[in-house]
UniProtKB/Swiss-Prot annotation:
Species annotation: Felis catus (Cat)
Binding site for Cu cation B: H362, H366, H389
PANTHER family cross-referenced by the UniProt entry: TYROSINASE, TYROSINASE FAMILY MEMBER
Stretches assigned to the Cytoplasmic side: 496-529
Reaction catalysis annotation: 2 L-dopa + O2 = 2 L-dopaquinone + 2 H2O; L-tyrosine + O2 = L-dopaquinone + H2O; 2 5,6-dihydroxyindole-2-carboxylate + O2 = 2 indole-5,6-quinone-2-carboxylate + 2 H2O
Pfam families with a match to the protein in the record: Tyrosinase (PF00264)
Top-level taxonomic group: Eukaryota
The protein, known as: Tyrosinase
Lineage: Eukaryota, Metazoa, Chordata, Craniata, Vertebrata
Keyword Transmembrane helix: yes
InterPro entries listed in its UniProt record: Di-copper_centre_dom_sf, Tyrosinase/Hemocyanin, Tyrosinase_Cu-bd
A GO CC annotation given for this chain: melanosome membrane
Stated family: Belongs to the tyrosinase family.
Lumenal side: 19-472
Gene3D superfamilies: Di-copper center containing domain from catechol oxidase
Amino acid sequence: MLLAALCCLLWSFRTSAGHFPRACASSKSLMEKECCPAWTGDSSPCGQLSGRGACQDITLSKAPLGPQYPFTGMDDREAWPSVFYNRTCQCFGNFMGFNCGNCKFGFWGPNCTEKRLLVRRNIFDLSVPEKNKFLAYLTLAKHTISPDYVIPIGTYGQMNNGSTPMFNDINVYDLFVWMHYYVSRDTLLGGSEIWKDIDFAHEAPGFLPWHRLFLLLWEQEIQKLTGDENFTIPYWDWRDAKSCDICTDEYMGGHNPANPNLLSPASFFSSWQIICTRLEEYNSRQALCDGTPRGPLLRNPGHDKARTPRLPSSADVEFCLSLTQYESDSMDKAANFSFRNTLEGFASPLTGIADASQSSMHNALHIYMNGTMSQVQGSANDPIFLLHHAFVDSIFEQWLRRHHPLQEVYPEANAPIGHNRESYMVPFIPLYRNGDFFISSRDLGYDYSNLQDSERDIFQDYIKPFLEQASRIWPWLIGAAVVGSVLTAVLGRLTSLLCRRKRKQLREERQPLLMEKEDYHSLLYQTHV
């Protein structure tokens, strides 16, 4: 009933998220390589007449890249987004968006001057109505076509360098599934040749900033779709879990009794269709995923013990947080003692040494789900993806608060393609740099309930010894206060008496030795009888 009501009531809400704006998918925009749509508020490109932004040339980073990708000019994602556009909206102040029609993260209001902090909460701390609303929002997004964005179904070359646009509509939820596919897909080299050692969002420094932006845009999209400006993505704290405790019909879907690889018919998500999962087919055809439905969600948690013998523990997380280096060595999945590589799951959470034979931390959850979520390109089809990555982001945030790194700690050069600090993140339009999200979540308008609680605990632990010491000397303090009060009263009385005596002496000393002139003459001319 809740879902039906939401669908009927909110179907007309317009949305905006990330990737190819519908307004920039024409042959004119592609051939002119310009994406500067008009803002509806004043009908000028980028809201320029209202001072919101301007259409400007894109300045690309010239920092050298790592050796992992040896080609140039073979992939549309290289030097993003220059293959498609070299001019986009550059927004001013707190404005943001492909036409500068939105506010930067953390700002609200018609002029983006109101600053607010939203809090992401543990999904198990949500009330039943809150949890049901979250599930309904997910399903609404799955059934609402994005009015503002489309997905390309061919490369720029296959579009005849923009003269023959190839784009499809897509629903709001699947837009983000497609983006996660596109950022991590293989490079199509022509014929039947591909290059697999490439990923613009994983296995390198940009893993955490990219997924941070992905969640922020997804969150913003749901806020606009539903009109619920207070919506935040809940997180799943999987530390020390013995099983998938959110894999129930009450939450993210239980087992189908007839087929353990499918979801229960009673689940919100049992009827969902997945996209972008046939990678070998796309590669063999040298084609992109076109958003065609490919069957139901698959999930059978905990049945690949060889690669994932257990879920991550609290000790594993604490070891990650203790690592002082964000990135190290080759800055890829072979990096040792790297916080990013250990949290991502390519290095052991016991030693910090890269280990290709095991999947730990973030990777462990994907493998543990044993289904759609276990394949990188299609993993965002499973809504557990959002809850999982929200918790991964909270660990990233905890590391930032513990170590207080300068932005310069994020690698400026020699990272794998797409991962340098000043590189624009694929496939987002408007444009965002990796380094822009190597900052505290509070500067982006959100926090985590578990981090707020832990900070209060840290403060209480800090002052606890002082409070205990104060409790031991409390009787003495009371006695001292009483004695002090008596002494203060006595001293005050003595001081008052001394002051009065002093004032009397001063009055006598201040009497004039000679009379005033008038009094003197009056006395002088007095007659005597």
